[in-house]
Amino acid sequence: DAVEVHAGHGDLISQFLSPYTNHRKDEFGGSLENRMRFMRMAMAEVMAAAGDDMAVLVKMNTRDGFRGGMEVPECIEVAKALEEIGVHALILSGGFVSRAPMYVMRGAMPIRSLTYYMQQFWLPIGVRIAGHMMIPTVPFKEAYFFEDALKFREAVKLPLVYVGGLVSREKIDMVLDAGFDGVSMARALLNEPDFVNRMAREENARNACEHANYCIAR
């Protein structure tokens, strides 16, 4: 029924968009308009292939989450460009996996679990020693992208899906009441797959996910 194109988190489209990774001197680098060129070309192909039979959603950053990356004003311009292209909805996230991974997820990364599948004998040792410096903790708070996402709600008219730290019906209602058209959850549903049904029954439903990130590390 739908396809989601990932244009955030340091994936390929995000690497073209971000001045942190895009150092090109040709028509694909430099100004924001040039850095958006690859995205426009890719999305034109996606929209043509989807036709009238499939919804096209794009996950994108509200900001990269570190100095030298994209900030909210530039990301809003990206959102406006995607609206102009005709995508059907945006999923608003943030962070850059290779540079600011915990800005995406928040909380601490359980380093010992992260090394579980590393086969070279020396690699787990090094990661366990320096892991917390390599992947610094970013404090978790519920609905942690909400303030930035509100600025996008004011700037564009297309449907917006909020993602980021939703673990209670109270906060989900807050997001929907603010004009967002949907929400996305991951860790909360890994912790409790039936959580959406429980929220329908319980006004004060809250998920027990502690955002310990063991599901990410393993």
Segments from the language model and where they lie:
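Flavin-dependent oxidoreductase catalytic cores
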Residues: 1-218
